[in-house]
Swiss-Prot record:
It holds the Pfam family Ig_J_chain. This is Immunoglobulin J chain. The lineage of its organism: Eukaryota, Metazoa, Chordata, Craniata, Vertebrata. It comes from Mus musculus (Mouse). GO terms for cellular component: dimeric IgA immunoglobulin complex; monomeric IgA immunoglobulin complex; pentameric IgM immunoglobulin complex; secretory dimeric IgA immunoglobulin complex; secretory IgA immunoglobulin complex. The gene is Jchain. Glycans are attached at N70. It comes from the Eukaryota. Residues 1-21 form the signal peptide. InterPro entries: Ig_J (IPR024110).
Length: 159
């Protein structure tokens, strides 16, 4: 009897795995690691009208607990407010080469890119490709000096 139940359990897991891998792939619209967000989109059949398809958007936000107001300063107070603007999360300002009528053109994927705004993006998590440092006191031979320490050593020091 236990073997019979075990086989049914394995079969249920296998069927679930097949159904999950058979799902339509979602298109990633934005994956902002700095703000811990991901926006995906996929086309699914409408439940109301079988002749129509609708766009389903999924917005995943991971709220990092115990993060600091200033992620580069370990002594700053804990962050209590997290503000997300969908237009900022989905903004893609990196230039992309697009072919238009046998001509390659460089364009951005967003029309709200403004190089002159000067306001840095608020990061709720370390961007692993960016080097973050802070000044820390170091005591050596009875003398205390302020030295710069890497908060993300992998991105600050090449192999």
């Amino acid at each position: 009897m236990k073997t019979h139940l075990l086989l049914w359990g394995v079969l249920a897991i296998f069927v679930k795995a097949v159904l999950v891998t058979g799902d339509d792939e979602a298109t990633i619209l934005a994956d902002n690691k700095c703000m811990c967000t991901r926006v995906t989109s996929r086309i699914i059949p409408s439940t109301e009208d079988p002749n129509e398809d609708i766009v389903e958007r999924n917005i995943r936000i991971v709220v990092p607990l115990n993060n600091r107001e200033n992620i580069s300063d370990p002594t700053s107070p804990l962050r209590r407010n997290f503000v997300y603007h969908l237009s900022d999360v989905c903004k893609k300002c990196d230039p992309v080469e697009v072919e238009l009528e046998d001509q390659v053109v460089t364009a951005t994927q967003s029309n709200i890119c403004n190089e002159d705004d000067g306001v840095p993006e608020t990061c709720y998590m370390y961007d692993r490709n960016k080097c973050y440092t802070t000044m820390v006191p170091l005591r050596y031979h009875g003398e205390t000096k302020m030295v710069q320490a890497a908060l993300t050593p992998d991105s600050c020091y090449p192999d």
